[in-house]
Amino acid sequence: MPLALVFSAIAVFEFGARYGATNMQAYAIASELKFPLNVFAQNEANMDNSSKEYFAMMIDKGIAAGAMHRQIWYLDRDAQAALDSLLGYALKVRGDAVTERYALMEASEDIPALNQTKLAKIREALAEAKVDLIDKAPKVAEQE
């Protein structure tokens, strides 16, 4: 019986640690995405092509990470709200270019099948995030 209590305590501790780490990761993804997104949104017209592509790649990577992370079922409401807020803005700034980037990567024959499967999951997560955060988002008139 005491051994069962030890194992249950370990399981509870591990779940709590995983839950907390997952929430902190959501905040980290949002904060890592914030700076390049603000720079890109404010200076896109003044950037040269190489800078624009570099910032777009960084932002797309952050959007993909956030879209995948928001699918975790035990994500805290506040952490998900912070992530969703920034992801919604990022998806508006980048538009369909994010999905196109990952579709082109998936269509490439140079990528192994395992990575193509991961890319397909990323594209599905991006599509779901776009529907939830852009298409189904309440309009300004509906919020008032």
Which residues does each predicted region cover?
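Transmembrane signal-anchor/signal-peptide helices with a preference for the extracytoplasmic
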Residues: L5-S31
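Low-complexity intrinsically disordered segments
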Residues: W73-E144
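Extracytoplasmic/periplasmic/luminal assembly and interaction segments
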Residues: I29, L33, L37-Y89
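N-terminal signal-anchor/signal peptide hydrophobic helix marking the start
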Residues: M1-L3
